[in-house]
Amino acid sequence: GNFAITEGAILAGCRFFAGYPITPATELAESMSLRLPQVGGVYLQAEDECAAMHLCIGAALGGYKAMTATSGPGFILYADPYGWALGCETPLVVLNSGRVGPVSGITGAPGQGEFYLMRYPTQGGNFETICLAANSAQECMAMTVEAFYLSERFRMPVSVLADQLITDGFEDISVPENEDEMKEMGFRVWPREVCRGPDFYPATDELDIPPVVLGHNTGALCSDWTPTEEGYDIEEVEAHHKHAYRLIYKVRNNKHLFNHLYEKKYMDDDPDLVVVSYGTPSRVVNTAVAKARQQGLKVGALRLINVWPFPDEHFTRRTKYLVVELNWDGELVREVQRAAPKDSEVHFLGSCGDLPTLPALIETFEKVIKDEPLTRKGWELEEW
């Protein structure tokens, strides 16, 4: 997965990477250090994660397509520069390869404990975020390309969320060799010649403007304070209203620009139970759903890929939902409970550092459909 992300970044035009080694994203930095010089790019190892993302912001302001990568303990250190990039509308791509927590946890075990951190990566509020979740090496490559596209289209940092099993795993991938093959595979890339224009635009949620304005040899005037339309600091509430409105609604009002071909529904014909997941658990879930249907259970699956902004539109059906996550505290399940119709049942099955087994999943499907209480490993799981 790490090497697939590297190839996806290079396909998208990435020519700058800064990072700090952390398992399970270290191999991505290693492969970037090898591949970027081969294509005329720049690799820098920073003194910490905070510095790494600031370096990427500086590179992006200078016209580079830039990227950084880390795991949960390092993503926390992105809080300051992530907010800076959001407020200054600076396009770059961030990979987070999740490992089990809290804190350092186990470096070689997968986790999904940063679901909400991807939505709220910095302080202050008044912004929207975009996050894509992959479940294979092939998707790691494809979604990295897509993340660069979205970052320039929306002028903001975009995150790719994976986990240890995906980024450390090895699978065959199909790499396009030219632009025609990229288009055939559904990849979208903004060519550099369209990324020109004035430094700043009026506060609006419209996107009929050049998607990014960087690298046109005039410098970029940026401020992490509330800016005027020319980029200077100002302390006026009306100006802040315009600025915050744009940061939120340029995303919310233009979700149709996301590549919804990536959304995956599986055996979704009027099921009694819809199993919701993302990342590595979705691979086990799909297999379990197929086996359960062979046994006569009406079960369907929904795998989320565009996880932020959260796709409320997928949860209009009044039915039973089971959310499967790589954590015990429950994060995705809270959003499903919020988005699902109020008379729907939403259940939770979590695991901590290990994947649920097929027998455990099928047993859980049966219990939810029959309204029996859920148990696992002796622990009573809370009903949401």
Kindly give the residue locations of the regions a language model identified.
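Flexible, low-complexity linker and terminal segments
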Residues: 1-2, 152-384
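Thiamine diphosphate
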Residues: 1-121, 128, 164, 362-365, ...
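Gly-rich Lys/Arg/Thr-decorated short loops/hinges at beta-loop-alpha junctions or inter-strand turns
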Residues: 10-13, 33-39, 95-97, 122-128, ...
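Structural motif
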Residues: 14-16, 41-44, 64-67, 90-94, ...
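Flexible loop/turn segments at secondary-structure boundaries
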Residues: 24-27, 52-53, 75-77, 101-104, ...
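A short acidic, amphipathic alpha-helical/loop segment
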Residues: 31, 55, 80-81, 146, ...
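Core active-site phosphate/anionic-ligand binding loop and the adjoining beta-turn-alpha structural block
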Residues: 89, 97, 103-175
